[in-house]
Amino acid sequence: MSRLRALTASLALIAPASAGAHQLNVFASVDCEAVLVEAKFSNGRAPVEGKVRVLDGENTLLTTLALEADGTRRVPLDGLDHSGGLVIEVDTGSHDDYWILTPEDIARHCGS
C-alpha cells in the first residue's frame, strides 16, 4: 500500500511539470516594414511546423503564412491594413498562442 502512495505522489509531482513543458509562446515585433513573429515552446525549442494567421483589429483574417523551420516568420506590412492593430496567431496543430500589436505599438516602431 505504501508503494502505491509513493507512486501516486510521484505522479502528482511529475504530471504538472510535463503538462507545462510544451506550452507555445509567441512574440511579435515591428520594424516598420514587417512584423517579425517568433514562436517557441517553453523548453526553448522551435516548432517544426505551424501556421501564422494575421488578423486585423476587428478579427478579420488578413493572411495565413507557414512558419519557417526556425519558428519565425517575417510578415510584410505592405498591403496589410494595420490601422486598427494586428492580432498574430500561431497554430502548430496541437498548440496555439497569440500576440497583439496595437496601433500605438506599430506607430512607435515606425517613428510616426
Residue spans for each PLM region:
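N-terminal signal peptide c-region/cleavage motif recognized by signal peptidases
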Residues: 14-18
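Bacterial N-terminal signal peptides that target proteins for export
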Residues: 1-8
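Glycine-centered loop-to-beta-strand initiation motif
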Residues: 63-77
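Short amphipathic beta-strand segments in non-cytosolic proteins
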Residues: 51-64
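Beta-strand-rich domain onsets/edges
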Residues: 19-36, 40, 58-59, 100-112
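Short, aromatic- and glycine-rich surface loops/edge beta-strands on solvent-exposed regions
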Residues: 82-96
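Exposed beta-strand and adjacent loop surfaces of beta-rich binding modules
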Residues: 23, 34, 47-51, 85-87
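A short beta-turn/strand-edge loop motif at beta-sheet boundaries
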Residues: 42-48, 81
